[in-house]
């Protein structure tokens, strides 16, 4: 049996540095039997944020890249296809999606994708079937 995966999006990697919440620990508590993953295109988006911004965003993107490259997270070699947006690709590859992006959460729920998100800047909530 294949293990279930939580796909972490770009803005969710920024949560620890915006709200001082350990997303890895919280996701592992909320979804203990799930593997934490992120697609390579999310890593590339974080690299772009680091390269093209200054100040806090640049620092947070750098820290998010270090977190994404930690041993707890598997980076999947998944590419964008046919001018696909990052959000469209995340919806294509996710059964459980960790995001704080309001529009992406709505689109995911409409497609029946379970969403993990930060609530009250303190803890992670799971919305959908697990």
Question: For each of these PLM feature ranges, what is it?
Answer:
Residues 1-71:
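Domain-level signal for Mg2+-assisted phosphodiester chemistry and nucleotide/NA-binding surfaces
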Residues 41-130:
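Nuclease catalytic cores that cleave nucleic-acid phosphodiester bonds
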């Amino acid at each position: 049996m294949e293990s279930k995966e939580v796909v972490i999006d770009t803005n969710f990697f920024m949560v620890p540095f915006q709200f001082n919440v350990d997303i890895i620990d919280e996701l592992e508590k909320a979804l203990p039997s799930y593997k934490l993953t992120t697609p390579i295109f999310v890593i590339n988006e974080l690299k772009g944020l680091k390269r093209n911004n200054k100040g806090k965003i640049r620092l947070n993107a750098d820290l998010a890249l270090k977190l994404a490259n930690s041993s707890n997270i598997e980076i999947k070699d998944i590419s964008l296809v046919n001018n696909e947006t990052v959000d469209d690709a995340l919806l294509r590859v996710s059964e459980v999606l960790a995001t704080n992006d309001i529009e992406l959460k709505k689109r995911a729920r409409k497609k029946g994708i379970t969403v993990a998100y930060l609530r009250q800047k303190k803890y992670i909530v799971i919305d959908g079937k697990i």
